[in-house]
Amino acid sequence: MGIEGFKALYHIPWCVSLQYNPLGDWHTHKKEREVVIPMIAFIEGGMRLPMGRITRNYLIANRIYPHQCAPNLFRVLGSVDTLNKQMGLGLTWHDIVWMNECHLLTESGYYLKSRSFEVRFILCLSKSNKGMKDDFVIVSGEWDLHCLTQEEAPGGVP
C-alpha cells in the first residue's frame, strides 16, 4: 500500500500532504510548520487528521510533539474524542489528566497509565503491527495544525 492508499484507509483529507520517512530520515526532510507522526499512531493508535479536540488540546497543554507519543497515548485520547462525538459527553483533556498519568518510556515515548484500577478505557484497536514503530510520515498542508511543530521539553505553559 502506498501513501495514497494509506490516506484513503485512514480517511486523511486530500488537502493534507503525507511524506513517508523511515526512522532517522525525517530529521533531514522535515520543514518548518510540518509535523512528524509515527505511522503506528494511525494503525494502532487510532490517530485521525484533523486531530480531535481532546488529542490536540492534550498535546498542546503538555507540550508534547506527536512523534514523542506511544500509540497508547493516541489510543486513549482518540477513544475519548470518539466518546465525545458519539455520546456528547463533553469530556476535556482535564478529564484525561484526572484519570491518567503521563509516563515516558525511553524507546516508546510518552504513554498514559490509568490512576485507578477500577476505571479504565476499553480500547479495541489492533496491536499487530510489529516493526512499524520506525516508520514515520511528515504531515503538511491544510489539516488545522494546532500542535507543536518544534520539539520542546514537555510540561509547563506553551
Model-identified regions with their sequence ranges:
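Residue-register detector that marks a fixed positional context within folded domains
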Residues: 1-158
